[in-house]
């Protein structure tokens, strides 16, 4: 049996200056393109956490907030807006969020590191297409668990069906096509460096700290990977004594 602890952190190959520039540019570009060109997918990505939000929540942490696209789907009260924290690791994208949504809190930071919030501070934690990117995934999930309210909090996650037939084919005519047209080079080095974690790995790590209380599959509402593009998960924090090593 493989020791799971030896899988992490996963190592990413270093980037040249040109590759780093392309990586930063495409991440921002794709966050702009996806809502416009592939709205039917983006609707699932962002409606799922809204539909399964805890009742009467106040404080939200969104990790890997991108350009703030998820906020277009929220219907927040004035107080909920003030208590909404968008965490984004790229400063240029964080600046874009703050410009569009000046009334929320925007923090530049890495969800794999300790966050500047007390234990159990948030009623909801959201991660939309984030966990597949993380080389230190267990640490990020443990930190989401730490800041999530253990009594009433929920963790909402959306991940791609990475490796499935449907997802691979869909990517060839969407992100891969855009990337190769824009930069005139192979998409492979970019996506192999970005999508590090498969669904089964992510779910295994989530279940160490959380209990899955709902699953949603898109576009076919059947619990199968090969025919779907995305999975939505709603999770409740386990009691400290219930967590697995």
Regions found by a protein language model. Give the residues of each.
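S-adenosyl-L-methionine-dependent methyltransferase catalytic module, highlighting the catalytic core
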Residues: 3-20, 25-28, 32-36, 113, ...
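A short acidic, Gly/Pro-enriched loop at the edge of an enzyme's catalytic core
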Residues: 112-124
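A short beta-strand submotif of the Rossmann-like class I SAM-dependent methyltransferase core
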Residues: 124-130
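Class I SAM-dependent methyltransferase SAM/SAH-binding core
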Residues: 66-113
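Conserved class I S-adenosyl-L-methionine
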Residues: 57-66
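Conserved alpha-helix/loop element of class I SAM-dependent methyltransferases that forms part
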Residues: 39-57, 73
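Residues at the starts of beta-strands that form the adenosine-phosphate
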Residues: 59, 83, 154
